[in-house]
């Protein structure tokens, strides 16, 4: 469970890097499928990007971990993602 939350934070930090304006809109859709979609919809979203079997398998493992989180937690992670991604602070470097 901690791995899934850690991965969510990592993905958000990638989105909110100084290059976030160049982030593919499809990435946000994949993130939504990761937290709110079915395993098959998430896998289909990943396949669109031709990740190769190792990366596809890793993504599927991540989805299985995320699915062990309570629904409310997954919904709150999506809300947190939206708050972070729409914040004017998103483009600032938050490294400590």
UniProtKB/Swiss-Prot annotation:
Subcellular localization, as worded in the UniProt entry: Secreted
InterPro entries found in the cross-reference section: Secretoglobin, Secretoglobin_1C-like, Secretoglobin_sf, Uteroglobin
Q: What is its main location?
A: secreted
Q: Which residues form the signal peptide?
A: 1-21
PROSITE patterns, per the entry: SCGB
Cellular compartments per GO CC: cytoplasm; extracellular space
Can the keyword Nucleotidyltransferase be found in this entry's annotation? no
What does this gene product do? Binds phosphatidylcholine, phosphatidylinositol, polychlorinated biphenyls (PCB) and weakly progesterone, potent inhibitor of phospholipase A2.
- Quaternary context: Antiparallel homodimer; disulfide-linked. Interaction with LMBR1L is controversial.
Instruction: Name the protein family.
Output: Belongs to the secretoglobin family.
Q: What name goes with this protein?
A: Uteroglobin
Q: What species is given as this protein's source?
A: Mesocricetus auratus (Golden hamster)
The organism that produces this protein has a lineage beginning with: Eukaryota, Metazoa, Chordata, Craniata, Vertebrata
- Gene responsible for this protein: SCGB1A1
